[in-house]
From Swiss-Prot:
This is Tyrosine--tRNA ligase. It is an enzyme of class 6 (ligase). L-tyrosine binds at residues 37, 175, 179. Its EC number is 6.1.1.1. ATP binds at residue 238. GO terms for molecular function: ATP binding; RNA binding; tyrosine-tRNA ligase activity. Residues 357-414 form the S4 RNA-binding domain. Keywords: Aminoacyl-tRNA synthetase, ATP-binding, Cytoplasm, Ligase, Nucleotide-binding, Protein biosynthesis, RNA-binding. It catalyses: tRNA(Tyr) + L-tyrosine + ATP = L-tyrosyl-tRNA(Tyr) + AMP + diphosphate + H(+). It comes from Pectobacterium carotovorum subsp. carotovorum (strain PC1). Homodimer. A motif ('KMSKS' region) lies at residues 235-239.
Length: 425
């Protein structure tokens, strides 16, 4: 992605929601590499899909020759950003936030290149400059540059200020000052000239631009990426089981892969522009091919493979493919013990059974049928499989040969209703 027309290319991919002084920023980028940053507050022990677009935007800038700074908010994570939040955030302990900072730092690192010469990435933590700052210095050196009149008129906090039942604490109200100072501090330390973030961060970004101009007498810029929405109006990055996390121990590579496989046709080509590094020409060609093939579109599989490989690596992608193929075909011999553990992690219904349990009991316990009588009917009609093999004997009792890795049995009713049996030792 060439630096000279980077803004235009980002716009063509739909990746810019707002930008300050677009002409001046484009001109500055054309003059040569800049340093830019994006902040990630540790509000949980993992980043989620909502963080992926700004994180990949950092990578896009680095690929164009610019120097990215990934800022983890060890200090701001202790306060909580009120932007467009209906209620006050729960304050987490310093120890908890400290643990989350390290996890998120490790999560961000694989996306950027920290050893590529002049534009090598930098990892920073804003606790480094806020941790030793006393309240008098904060108020005198930072607070004096902020107008309360302007702060209360920012859209990000207006809704809270106008609600008598919730309001906003001074703690969260001060967040804007902290993030603003991040920009000024990074500008002074690393000559950072651009902040990027989600569109909900616009108010915080413009505060940082104003503060940097006042404190450092430097012109800097801001750019936001859009809030990702789905064509049906539902929230992106959420499932019935909750958020889709980037941490494999919270959302397995298989579930992550399936999330992308299930992307609607109306969204998939747009998501390829947001979440992959495929060229626009290749995405357009894929869309044209899908329209003319008369078959199920390939785009979902391309999207799932590209993003899963990027987040979970080749091994994670291979595991996701293996589980998907095994469940689809019913041939489980290729699945590993870790693959079964992924299914258990992903929320597949699980029951524990004692030795000697029969098939009818298992179907009822798994709530795949309401009664033993219904279980008999389902079994007799060849609607039940054990580890991918049909079982038509209503009186069937499980044996040791049904246990995969001496631990698991996969039960299925019909085509889509699964349960994983975990046998008690």
């Amino acid at each position: 992605m060439a630096s000279s027309n980077l803004i235009k290319q980002l716009q063509e991919r739909g990746l810019i929601a707002q930008v300050t002084d677009e002409g001046a920023l484009a001109e500055r980028l054309a003059q040569g590499p800049i340093a830019l940053y994006c902040g990630f507050d540790p509000t949980a022990d993992s980043l989620h899909l909502g963080h992926l677009v700004p994180l990949l935007c950092l990578k896009r800038f680095q690929l164009a020759g610019h120097k990215p700074v990934a800022l983890v908010g060890g200090a701001t994570g202790l306060i909580g950003d009120p932007s467009f939040k209906a209620t006050e955030r729960k304050l987490n302990t310093a120890d908890t936030v400290g643990e989350w900072v390290e996890k998120i730092r490790r999560q961000v690192s694989p996306f950027l290149d920290f050893d590529c010469g002049k534009n090598s990435a930098i990892a920073a933590n804003n606790y480094d400059w806020f941790g030793g700052m006393n309240v008098l210095d904060f108020l005198r050196d930072i607070g004096k540059h902020f107008s309360v009149n302007q702060m209360i008129n920012k859209e990000a906090v207006k809704q809270r200020l106008n609600r008598d039942d919730v309001g906003i604490s001074f703690t969260e109200f001060s967040y804007n000052l902290l993030q603003g100072y991040d920009f000024a501090s990074l500008n002074k330390q690393h000559d950072v000239e651009l902040q990027i973030g989600g569109s909900d961060q616009w108010g915080n970004i413009t505060s940082g631009i104003d503060l940097t101009r006042r404190m450092n007498q430097k012109q800097v810029y801001g750019l936001t990426v859009p809030l990702i929405t789905k064509s049906d109006g539902t929230k992106f990055g959420k499932t019935e089981g909750g958020a889709i996390w980037l941490d494999a121990s919270k959302t397995s590579p298989y579930k992550f892969y399936q999330f992308w496989i299930n992307t609607a046709d109306a969204d998939v080509y747009r998501f390829l522009k947001f979440f992959t590094f495929m060229s626009l020409e290749d995405i357009d060609a894929l869309e044209e091919e899908d329209k003319n093939s008369g078959k199920a579109p390939r785009a979902q599989y391309v999207l799932a493979e590209e993003v899963t490989r990027m987040v979970h690596g080749e091994a994670g992608l291979e595991a996701a493919r293996r589980i998907t193929q095994s469940l689809f075909s019913g041939a489980l011999q290729d699945m590993t013990q870790d693959d079964f553990a992924q299914l258990a992690q992903d929320g597949m219904p699980i029951i524990e059974l004692e030795n000697g349990a029969d098939l009818q009991q298992a179907l009822v316990s798994a709530e795949l049928v309401p009664s033993r009588g219904q279980a008999r009917t389902m079994i007799s009609s060849n609607a039940v499989t054990i580890n991918g093999e049909k079982q038509a004997d209503p009186e069937y009792t499980f044996s040791a040969s049904d246990r995969l890795f001496d631990r698991y049995t996969l039960l299925r009713r019909g085509k889509k209703h699964y349960c994983l049996i975990c046998w008690k030792a």
